[in-house]
């Protein structure tokens, strides 16, 4: 899932915004692509040091600490955006903030916990790539299909 998400947002290289570092899996996949810069916003106090340590060996990574919504006005525009914060309670804020973060051709995706292609987030013209997966039995995601949202501006 994270590999496919990274491949989509990094397809054209450029400047990438990742909202939510988590375990750093997607960040690692993003760096398997040729990207100019990688801006990561992380809010969780236990994850911030892990993100900073991960980024310390990379010259093109900037870690911004805090809530993404509180810092959004200081951000630039990006060629790719991956939104993966804990829970989806801020997706409406994210969808209404996208226009200030994108330019022509920007690719956007997000963690989609929905079991189908339903677009609950008021983001028009979203395509979905169906991925066949085999999650571990003890995983919180227990479907054999994942619907990767793809939005290009």
Q: What residues fall within each predicted segment?
A:
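A short acidic, Gly/Pro-enriched loop at the edge of an enzyme's catalytic core
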Residues: 69-81, 85, 89
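C-terminal substrate-binding/active-site "lid" region of AdoMet-derived donor-dependent transferases
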Residues: 46-50, 54, 89-153
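Residues at the starts of beta-strands that form the adenosine-phosphate
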Residues: 15, 36-37, 60, 107
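Conserved alpha-helix/loop element of class I SAM-dependent methyltransferases that forms part
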Residues: 1-14
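S-adenosyl-L-methionine
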Residues: 41-75
């Amino acid at each position: 899932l994270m590999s496919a998400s990274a491949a989509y947002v990094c397809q054209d290289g450029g400047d990438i915004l990742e909202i939510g570092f988590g375990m750093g899996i997607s960040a690692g996949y993003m760096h398997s692509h040729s990207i100019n810069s990688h801006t990561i916003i992380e809010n969780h106090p236990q994850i911030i040091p892990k993100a900073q340590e991960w980024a310390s060996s990379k010259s093109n990574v900037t870690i911004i600490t805090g809530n993404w919504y509180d810092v959004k006005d200081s951000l630039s525009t990006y060629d790719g955006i991956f939104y993966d914060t804990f829970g989806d309670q801020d997706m409406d804020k994210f969808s209404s903030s996208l226009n200030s973060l994108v330019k022509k051709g920007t690719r956007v995706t997000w963690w989609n916990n929905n079991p189908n292609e339903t677009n609950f987030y008021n983001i028009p013209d979203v395509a979905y790539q169906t991925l066949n997966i085999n999650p571990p039995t003890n995983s919180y995601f227990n479907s054999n299909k994942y619907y990767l949202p793809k939005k290009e501006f």
